[in-house]
Amino acid sequence: MGTFTLHQGQSNLIKSFFRNYYLNAELGLPNDMELREFALQPFGSDTYIRHLSFSSSEELRDYLVNRNLPLHLFYSSARYQLPSARDMEEKAWMGSDLLFDIDADHICKLRSIRFCPVCGNAITSEKCERDNVETLEYVEMTSECIKRGLEEARNLVEILEDDFGLKPKVYFSGNRGFHVQVDCYGDCALLDSDERKEIAEYVMGVGVPSYPGGSESAPGWVGRKNRGINGVTIDGQVTIDVKRLIRIPNSLHGKSGLIVKEVTNLDDFEFNEALSPFTGYTIFLPYISIETEVLSRNIKLNRGVPIKIESSIGIYLHLKNLGEVKAYVR
């Protein structure tokens, strides 16, 4: 099968955008980073580089910029005595933060298109027989769907604060949803997978009875049920996993070019170009003709017709497989 390589991170221009970002980025690193495993997916690779350990932000920055530029960048929710050990038992687990993952595409039905990047035809299979290349898929992420994900995050925060007395932090994932994280120490950090499963099922509303006739302002599930909240849509496997990798706050998501960003005020969050660090303009060459919503804007593309567009939008479109960024214009 032919290989079509000018997409997702294989462009040298996209790499230069990412490298310039990481030269000065203030990554949100834990204060015990020497106990965390770091991992990344480099440009041009489908596999992860794991079992990395760093003792300072400067050491990490040097590695990212000069050795392995990341398309995706993570650290472990777990703390380890030897985070760089390749054997998981040898790492010696010391406890983990508590994680929740909300994917907007699990909440909404999103429009998706599979197409050939050479001829531009819509194709349902993974290969275009005519051009002998792999097809690409584009999934449209709408602001309305992101809003629904944000509402799930709001409900989750309420449960964790009111019912468990925890102090969760909410992060935009950089692509299609939200991560909710509780920095855990002591007993919280030592919760095993079964105990975390109980928490996951609780916030999802598993086994919670109905409370007909209750007050909407009542505390706990009585009030939630009477406000129409039956549970939070999370990926339970993320919460159960005590050795999960977390996207590093203020890193870039390799499928969008957007920043993994803490949302300190849920009421102020907007899914728009402000989530991108990139300025100036790009020349973008579309693979297909399409009208689509991009970061809360309606964008019209014509196959093979280059357009000058904001870098935030052009890089997003490139990483979403809709075409190529051909040039940067200040």
UniProtKB/Swiss-Prot annotation:
Keyword field contains Membrane: no
Listed GO CC annotations: DNA-directed RNA polymerase complex; primosome complex
One GO-annotated biological process of the protein: DNA replication, synthesis of primer
UniProt xrefs under InterPro entries: DNA_primase_S (IPR002755), DNA_primase_ssu_euk/arc (IPR014052), DNA_primase_ssu_PriS (IPR023639)
Keyword presence, Nucleotidyltransferase: yes
Alphabetical list of Pfam families matching this protein: DNA_primase_S, PriS_C
Chain sites annotated for binding Zn(2+): C116, C119, C128, D131
Top EC class, one word: transferase
CDD domains, per database record: AE_Prim_S
Function: Catalytic subunit of DNA primase, an RNA polymerase that catalyzes the synthesis of short RNA molecules used as primers for DNA polymerase during DNA replication. The small subunit contains the primase catalytic core and has DNA synthesis activity on its own. Binding to the large subunit stabilizes and modulates the activity, increasing the rate of DNA synthesis while decreasing the length of the DNA fragments, and conferring RNA synthesis capability. The DNA polymerase activity may enable DNA primase to also catalyze primer extension after primer synthesis. May also play a role in DNA repair.
Subunit structure: Heterodimer of a small subunit (PriS) and a large subunit (PriL).
Name the UniProt record assigns to this protein: DNA primase small subunit PriS
Biological source species: Saccharolobus islandicus (strain L.S.2.15 / Lassen #1)
